[in-house]
Each structure stands twice: as C-alpha cells, then as structure tokens.
C-alpha cells in the first residue's frame, strides 16, 4: 500500500511515519502543503491520501479517485472537512484518528477557563512588563451557563468534567 500525506507536520507527525511504515509494510510520501488543485497529482499511484482538517473540495476527491485512491484516513478527530457523500459516491472509505475523550475535553475546558480569565491578554501584557490590573478582571465560571453542542463521547466528557465547576449546563 502507498499513502500520500498532505500537510504533514514535521515537528510531531513525521516521526511516526518511518517506524509504522516498516512495521506495517506501508510505503509513503509526504508534503507539508495542504491539498490544492496544483498539488493533487502528488497522489498519483497512491492507494490512500491522509490529511489533517484542511479543506477537501469534491473536485479533489474526483481527481484522487481517478488516480486510484480508495482510502482517506484523516489525522483529526472528525472528518467534516471531507465531502462524505461525494466520497461514498466515488467508493472511497474515510477513517479518522481516535483521541482520548478526557484529553480533548480537558483541553476544551482549559481554553474556556483561559478565555474567562483573559490569560492571553495577561500574558501579552506581562511580555511588555505591564503587570497592572486594569482590564484583567476575569469571569467566574461557577456563575455562568455553559452550553455544549454535540454530546457524543467528547461532549459528554466535557459536561461531566464541567459539572465539578458548579456552572449551569445545557446540552
């Protein structure tokens, strides 16, 4: 099997390619570029095209299918960036990575807390040696109503973890 990786990150993803290639007998080629009409030909001779959550237009799928690509493994939790109906019509299979729901939920909650406490602003001002308190007053999550759209594994885990904060939850 030959797989073409688009938008492969050299600082973390690339390190896995060589050992898994040898372990599973998979040949691969990669580019750091996202798929564009100008580089679709890179997938010629490949059985699979792997992407991150970058835009995949229906025309890309048509071009890849004409080259013999049958499998689209995504390096992301979801695959909403791929036109699923078009892939199905072309006989292409889509898969996606599994991530621990608790890790993703905790990351989402961390970002919520950082926004509520204006951490970005605080860090930027600290870089400029500005430690004044003006405009740094955050919001208390316990007094907030938090809505979660999508209550699959990750959404349910977010709700469960947020329940300890005492905020009102909507799902």
Q: Where do the language-model regions lie?
A:
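N-terminal glycine-/charge-rich "phosphate-binding" loop or analogous flexible N-terminal tail
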Residues: 1-46
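Short, well-ordered beta-strand segments
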Residues: 2-6, 50, 70, 147
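Short beta->alpha connector loops
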Residues: 9-11, 32-36, 52-57, 76-79, ...
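General small-molecule cofactor/ligand-binding pocket signal
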Residues: 27-31, 95, 170
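Short gly/ser/thr-rich secondary-structure transition/capping motifs
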Residues: 27-34, 52-54, 125-134
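A short, aliphatic-rich alpha-helical micro-motif
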Residues: 42-44, 66, 141
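Phosphate/diphosphate ligand-binding glycine-rich loop within oxidoreductases
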Residues: 46-123, 135
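Rossmann-like dinucleotide/phosphate-binding beta-alpha-beta segment
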Residues: 136-171
């Amino acid at each position: 099997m030959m797989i073409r990786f688009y938008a492969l990150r050299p600082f973390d993803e690339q390190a896995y390619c060589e050992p898994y290639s040898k372990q599973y007998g998979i040949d691969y080629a990669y580019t750091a570029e996202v798929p564009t009409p100008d580089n679709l030909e890179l997938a010629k001779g490949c059985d699979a095209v792997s992407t991150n959550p970058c835009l995949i237009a229906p025309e890309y799928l048509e071009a890849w299918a004409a080259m013999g690509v049958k499998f689209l493994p995504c390096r992301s939790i979801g695959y909403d960036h791929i036109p699923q109906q078009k892939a199905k019509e072309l006989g292409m299979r889509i898969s996606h990575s599994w991530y621990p729901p608790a890790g993703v939920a905790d990351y989402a909650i961390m970002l919520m807390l950082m926004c509520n406490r204006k951490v970005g602003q605080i860090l930027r001002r600290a870089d400029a040696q500005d430690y004044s308190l003006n405009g740094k007053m955050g919001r208390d999550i316990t007094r907030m109503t938090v809505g979660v759209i999508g209550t699959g594994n990750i959404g349910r885990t977010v709700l469960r973890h947020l329940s300890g904060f005492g905020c009102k939850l909507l799902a």
